[in-house]
């Protein structure tokens, strides 16, 4: 059993989602958004760090998963997003959590079966997969998607590791 904290980073709104993985089953523990109020970026980064640190203290996750930065046409936006990610990652590292990163396309593929899915599709699938009574906020749904992706990726890697022997069989050696 492990608790996974997923993060959808943003310099204004950072989504978070926490799930518990018990074997093949996933259970919803909590989600929401860290909304920054500061006008200047350094103040927003401080709020992201403090918010993620508080979530880590509250839920005591075993692992931290975060969405990777995608290249944007707007370099300034991409840089701010990278700094927001950095603030969240530092909070995880300070709590001695292992950090895993996933591309947005992989997350959408893992959750909806379509790497080009829109936010509404992700929200609907997250709601269905975690048996939520209502559609989560878009940023929180994305963060839950990050956590689900890690749970499913980790499950696959563990299964493969159990079957791998390192020896090849057959006529080609």
Swiss-Prot record:
Binding site for Mg(2+) 2: 67
GO cellular component, one term: cytoplasm
Gene Ontology process terms (BP): DNA recombination; DNA repair
Subcellular location: Cytoplasm
Catalyses which reaction(s): Endonucleolytic cleavage at a junction such as a reciprocal single-stranded crossover between two homologous DNA duplexes (Holliday junction)
Xref: InterPro entries: RNaseH-like_sf, RNaseH_sf, X-over_junc_endoDNase_RuvC
A Pfam entry, by short name: RuvC
Top-level class of the enzyme under EC nomenclature: hydrolase
SUPFAM superfamilies, A to Z: Ribonuclease H-like
Note accompanying the cofactor annotation: Binds 2 Mg(2+) ion per subunit.
GO MF, one example: crossover junction DNA endonuclease activity
Keywords: Cytoplasm, DNA damage, DNA recombination, DNA repair, DNA-binding, Endonuclease, Hydrolase, Magnesium, Metal-binding, Nuclease
Residues at which Mg(2+) 1 binds: 8, 139
Catalytic residues of the enzyme: 8, 67, 139
Required co-factors: Mg(2+)
Entry EC number(s): 3.1.21.10
Subunit field text: Homodimer which binds Holliday junction (HJ) DNA. The HJ becomes 2-fold symmetrical on binding to RuvC with unstacked arms; it has a different conformation from HJ DNA in complex with RuvA. In the full resolvosome a probable DNA-RuvA(4)-RuvB(12)-RuvC(2) complex forms which resolves the HJ.
Family according to the record: Belongs to the RuvC family.
Function of the molecule: The RuvA-RuvB-RuvC complex processes Holliday junction (HJ) DNA during genetic recombination and DNA repair. Endonuclease that resolves HJ intermediates. Cleaves cruciform DNA by making single-stranded nicks across the HJ at symmetrical positions within the homologous arms, yielding a 5'-phosphate and a 3'-hydroxyl group; requires a central core of homology in the junction. The consensus cleavage sequence is 5'-(A/T)TT(C/G)-3'. Cleavage occurs on the 3'-side of the TT dinucleotide at the point of strand exchange.
Protein name as annotated: Crossover junction endodeoxyribonuclease RuvC
Organism listed in the record: Vibrio atlanticus (strain LGP32)
């Amino acid at each position: 059993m492990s608790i996974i904290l997923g993060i959808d980073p943003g310099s204004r709104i950072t989504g978070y989602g926490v799930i518990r993985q018990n074997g093949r089953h996933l259970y919803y523990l909590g989600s929401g958004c860290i909304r920054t109020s500061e006008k200047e970026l350094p103040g927003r980064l401080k709020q992201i760090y403090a918010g993620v640190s508080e979530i880590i203290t509250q839920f005591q996750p075993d692992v931290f998963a975060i969405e990777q930065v995608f290249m944007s046409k707007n370099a300034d936006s991409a840089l701010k997003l990278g700094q927001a990610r950095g603030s969240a990652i530092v909070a995880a590292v300070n709590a001695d959590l292992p950090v895993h990163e996933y591309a947005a396309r992989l997350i959408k593929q893992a959750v909806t079966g379509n790497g080009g899915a829109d936010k509404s599709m992700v929200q609907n699938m997250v709601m269905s997969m975690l048996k939520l009574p209502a559609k989560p906020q878009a940023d929180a749904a994305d963060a839950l998607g990050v956590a689900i992706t890690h749970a499913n990726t980790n499950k696959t890697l563990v299964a493969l590791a159990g079957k791998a022997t390192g020896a090849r069989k057959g006529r080609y050696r």
